[in-house]
Curated annotation (Swiss-Prot):
Domain of life: Bacteria
Listed SUPFAM superfamilies: P-loop containing nucleoside triphosphate hydrolases
Native source species: Aster yellows witches'-broom phytoplasma (strain AYWB)
Name of the protein described by the UniProt record: Energy-coupling factor transporter ATP-binding protein EcfA
Source taxonomy: Bacteria, Bacillati, Mycoplasmatota, Mollicutes, Acholeplasmatales
A Pfam family this chain is assigned to: ABC_tran
Claim: ATP-binding is one of the keywords in the record: yes
Membrane topology (UniProt): Peripheral membrane protein
Membrane-crossing segments per the record: none
Domain ABC transporter: 2-231
Purpose: ATP-binding (A) component of a common energy-coupling factor (ECF) ABC-transporter complex. Unlike classic ABC transporters this ECF transporter provides the energy necessary to transport a number of different substrates.
Residues engaged in binding ATP: 34-41
E.C. number(s) listed in UniProt: 7.-.-.-
Metal-binding found in the keyword field: no
Length: 271
């Protein structure tokens, strides 16, 4: 479990995060959304121990996040960044997935087994002997995910992990993320369509935590989304347009509208 209490972070004299309080349960998937500059990536860097916060407390798996405990906490957390090109230096897919394990003195037989297991999980087992530099952006990001999974962290952060990918590559990576179980998953994203698949959505706005609630509750509140500059999934945009039109024409069949909303919501979840 991750517990954050009264977290405040300043960059120079500017407050980037202001008195953040939230709890993320074990084996849950949360999405953190918000416009640019809301503090999403800053929060991720703090959780990784890359930035020291000014006030508050973070407890991860009953361990307080501080400089003394960083060597204990860092192996518990993995991160997938925006750009899949940042770490590749001419290795094969097999070598890249094995790289971190070799640094942790894992025995050769276990490395071979883990490489194959996680390559299959992200559907790149047919690419194991291919040079990573020859892969598409989506394939590279899947290699990154396999490398992180092979380290078996308890928490994985996806920091805009699909934003550099074409639509097909982004969809492939999103589907893989949805298959990961028994970990805390934190997806930082602008894509509310993708965020709607998670257990909870956390909204940050100008460094403040606005809400933490289930996607269906949040995404069916058009006034809230408009207030905090969030774009709803396309299927729900259609519902809002129909709702607006029905209001204009004074259509009062509320049950029909509710049924339509549920149909569009279920369609959104199945995409």
């Amino acid at each position: 479990m991750i517990s954050i209490q009264n977290l405040t972070f300043y960059y120079g004299c500017n407050p980037i995060l202001k008195d953040i309080n939230l709890t993320i349960q074990n084996n849950s998937w949360v999405s953190i959304v918000g416009h640019n500059g809301s503090g999403k990536s800053t929060l991720a860097k703090i959780l990784l121990g890359l930035l020291a916060f000014n006030k508050g407390q973070i407890v991860i798996d009953n361990i307080v996040l501080n400089e003394k405990n960083l060597p204990i906490l860092r192996p518990k957390i993995g991160i997938v960044f925006q750009n899949p090109d940042y770490q590749f230096t001419g290795l094969t897919v097999r070598e890249d997935i094995a790289f971190g394990l070799e640094n942790y003195n894992v025995c050769r037989e276990e490395i071979i087994a883990k490489v194959l297991k996680y390559a299959k999980m992200v559907k790149i087992d047919d690419l194991l002997d291919k040079n990573v530099n020859q892969l598409s952006g989506g394939q590279k990001q899947r290699v990154t995910i396999a490398s992180i999974l092979a380290m078996e962290p308890e928490i994985i952060i996806f920091d805009e992990a699909t934003s550099f990918l074409d639509p097909q590559g982004a969809l492939e990576v999103q589907k893989i993320i949805q298959t990961i179980k028994n970990k805390i998953l934190i997806t930082i994203t602008h894509d509310l369509d993708f965020a709607s698949k998670s257990d909870e959505i956390i909204v940050l706005y100008q460094g403040k935590l606005i809400t933490q609630r289930p996607p269906k509750n949040l995404l069916q509140d058009p006034l809230f989304l408009q207030q905090y500059k969030l774009t709803p999934p396309l299927s729900l945009q259609l519902y809002y347009e129909i709702l607006k039109d029905s209001t204009t024409k004074k259509i009062k069949n509320n049950q029909m509208l509710e049924n339509l909303k549920d149909i569009l919501w279920q369609y959104n979840l199945k995409k």
